[in-house]
């Protein structure tokens, strides 16, 4: 199961005593700041969590899987995430929930 923004808002409501509206606004504002920074070409560093980076990919040859026709895959910018050491360690030592 995936963690959603709604669940994050609910956790903030329960743990910090924020109103549901304020908790939702805080989550939205956080993600909007991450989006804004990436749109402006900035790296996003979240200490203890990881880094969001932008990477430019060059045009490359590809193939249409249905027809087998060779087609160019256009150059584009992609977002990558590199987890920090603290996050890696915690995930590796966590016991999976079933």
Curated annotation (Swiss-Prot):
Any one GO BP annotation for this protein: regulation of DNA-templated transcription
Pfam family membership, one: Bac_DNA_binding
UniProt keywords, alphabetically: DNA recombination, DNA-binding, Transcription, Transcription regulation, Translation regulation
GO annotations of cellular component type: cytosol
Gene3D superfamilies: IHF-like DNA-binding proteins
Region listing for Disordered, in residue ranges: 49-70
InterPro entries (alphabetical): Hist_DNA-bd (IPR000119), Histone-like_DNA-bd_CS (IPR020816), IHF-like_DNA-bd_dom_sf (IPR010992), IHF_alpha (IPR005684)
UniProt-listed CDD domains: IHF_A (cd13835)
Cross-referenced PANTHER family: DNA-BINDING PROTEIN HU (PTHR33175), INTEGRATION HOST FACTOR SUBUNIT ALPHA (PTHR33175:SF2)
Subunit structure as annotated in this protein's UniProt entry: Heterodimer of an alpha and a beta chain.
Annotated function: This protein is one of the two subunits of integration host factor, a specific DNA-binding protein that functions in genetic recombination as well as in transcriptional and translational control.
Entry similarity comment: Belongs to the bacterial histone-like protein family.
HAMAP family in UniProt: IHF_alpha
UniProt-recorded name of the protein: Integration host factor subunit alpha
Gene designation per UniProt: ihfA
